[in-house]
């Protein structure tokens, strides 16, 4: 018999200490990594539920094991809510991650060696969009497209590459692009060469759900996303489509049994909660503030003489190009981290430095907005960051900035 008062603190002091330390770090550090966010206690309650005990290979109503009648209800709720939230006929909520969702799309629609057109990682794409170190770059013939000198996706170049190479699939989406993507134009290009349009909207799914960023769903054959990031749910993946039953069968088979076995029912329950939360008015207001805060920070960085890739942002993130400042992304990351400001070093277009050093940092506002930062707070934060970057290695500036960070974190806790 398992007693409900069993806990980690009394049993595993080392692990409990690590959890407590991470909890404190999240409260006392400003989180600016664009792919990170804080999920709600309701989502965490679902993830800590007894649904974790149930094996449920297959899909609702078509399981390989018995006793799935209640987890079927939970998964169907997640499916129905995802379809309603994003306006689609089909949703698969089982992928354990965004990368596994993307892998399933490749498996469903392509054969090894097929040609794919994807955004270059160096220009803002993602590992799973054809990077040579990833399965997508190893198993498929990848033709990269990028951005022009103004920092915008070059659709004319994309069309020329498509006409020349005749890809079977064109991939839209990004991990470090701050502008609006023209999904309609991408579909037109795909149709000219009879290619699938596959969009990975992981970074902007929350903005799309709230109407703050154009949706790719009416244009793409298949759309994937993570369920964390701007969507603020549990860590996991999601596949969406409106392309018909044949497509849905291929996608389902590619997830199970093609790439995964048993789904994580406790995480799927967390997704169901997050999708319901994303339909609330306060979620829409939150996403609007995410964009406003990003724009406020960009304006302040520019006022202080820092170059922003694409000269601004239309979503939740932006890249600060530090080449002219002769600061590496690695050094900027470390200095800001010492002031309790968490960012990630990031390559910028035509970066002369390696991906392990880089010449830029990526900044995102979902997490700070989640804890209540206003536009004025965002401007103050950008100024503090500029103070640190203007004085790289100055311990007094770093310490003074850290104290400001601790004060605002105390005023705006993540979990009150």
From Swiss-Prot:
Modification N6-(pyridoxal phosphate)lysine occurs at: 229
Annotated GO MF terms: glycine hydroxymethyltransferase activity; pyridoxal phosphate binding
Required cofactor names: pyridoxal 5'-phosphate
Disulfide bonds listed in the record: none
E.C. designation(s): 2.1.2.1
Subcellular localization: Cytoplasm
GO CC annotation terms, alphabetical: cytosol
Pathway it works in: One-carbon metabolism; tetrahydrofolate interconversion; Amino-acid biosynthesis; glycine biosynthesis; glycine from L-serine: step 1/1
UniProt site (Plays an important role in substrate specificity): 228
Subcellular location, principal: cytoplasm
Domain of life: Bacteria
Keyword field: Amino-acid biosynthesis, Cytoplasm, One-carbon metabolism, Pyridoxal phosphate, Transferase
Gene3D superfamilies from the UniProt entry: Aspartate Aminotransferase, domain 1, Type I PLP-dependent aspartate aminotransferase-like (Major domain)
EC class of the enzyme, as a word: transferase
Catalytic activity from the UniProt record: (6R)-5,10-methylene-5,6,7,8-tetrahydrofolate + glycine + H2O = (6S)-5,6,7,8-tetrahydrofolate + L-serine
Residues that bind (6S)-5,6,7,8-tetrahydrofolate: 121, 125-127, 245, 354-356
HAMAP family the UniProt entry points to: SHMT (MF_00051)
Assembly, per entry: Homodimer.
Family the entry assigns: Belongs to the SHMT family.
Function according to Swiss-Prot or TrEMBL: Catalyzes the reversible interconversion of serine and glycine with tetrahydrofolate (THF) serving as the one-carbon carrier. This reaction serves as the major source of one-carbon groups required for the biosynthesis of purines, thymidylate, methionine, and other important biomolecules. Also exhibits THF-independent aldolase activity toward beta-hydroxyamino acids, producing glycine and aldehydes, via a retro-aldol mechanism.
Name by which UniProt lists this protein: Serine hydroxymethyltransferase 1
Gene name of the encoded protein: glyA1
């Amino acid at each position: 018999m398992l007693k409900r008062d069993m806990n980690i603190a009394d049993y595993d002091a080392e692990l409990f200490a690590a959890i407590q330390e991470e909890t404190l770090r999240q409260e006392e550090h400003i989180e600016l990594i664009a792919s990170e966010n804080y999920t709600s206690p309701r989502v965490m309650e679902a993830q800590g539920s007894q649904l974790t005990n149930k094996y449920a290979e297959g899909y609702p109503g078509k399981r390989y094991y018995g006793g799935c009648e209640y987890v079927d209800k939970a998964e169907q709720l997640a499916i129905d809510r995802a379809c309603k939230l994003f306006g689609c006929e089909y949703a698969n909520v089982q992928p354990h991650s965004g990368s596994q969702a993307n892998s399933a799309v490749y498996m469903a629609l392509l054969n090894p060696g097929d040609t794919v057109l994807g955004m270059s990682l160096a220009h803002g794409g993602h590992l799973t969009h054809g990077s040579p170190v990833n399965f997508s770059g190893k198993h498929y013939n990848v033709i990269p497209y990028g951005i022009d000198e103004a920092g915008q996706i070059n659709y004319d170049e994309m069309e020329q590459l498509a006409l020349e190479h005749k890809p079977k699939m064109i991939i839209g989406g990004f991990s470090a692009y701050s502008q609006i993507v023209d999904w309609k134009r991408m579909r037109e290009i795909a149709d000219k060469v009879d290619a699938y349009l596959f969009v990975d909207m992981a970074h902007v799914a929350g903005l799309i759900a709230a109407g703050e960023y154009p949706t790719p769903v009416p244009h793409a054959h298949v759309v994937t996303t993570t369920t964390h990031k701007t969507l603020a749910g549990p860590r996991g993946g999601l596949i969406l489509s409106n392309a018909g039953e044949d497509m849905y069968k291929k996608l389902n088979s590619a997830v199970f049994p093609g790439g995964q076995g048993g789904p994580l029912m406790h995480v799927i329950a967390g997704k169901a909660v997050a999708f319901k939360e994303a339909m609330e008015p306060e979620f829409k207001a939150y996403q609007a503030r995410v964009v406003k805060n990003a724009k406020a920070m960009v304006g302040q960085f520019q006022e202080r003489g820092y170059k922003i890739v694409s000269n601004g942002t239309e979503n939740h993130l932006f890249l600060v190009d530090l080449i002219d400042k002769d600061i590496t992304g690695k050094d900027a990351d470390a200095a800001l981290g010492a002031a309790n400001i968490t960012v990630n070093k990031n390559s910028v277009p035509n970066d002369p430095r390696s991906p392990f050093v880089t010449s830029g940092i990526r900044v995102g506002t979902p997490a700070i907005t989640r804890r209540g930062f206003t536009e004025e707070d965002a401007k103050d934060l950008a100024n503090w960051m500029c103070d640190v970057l203007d004085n790289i290695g100055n311990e007094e500036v770093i310490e003074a900035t850290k104290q400001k960070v601790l004060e605002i974190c105390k005023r705006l806790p993540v979990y009150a």
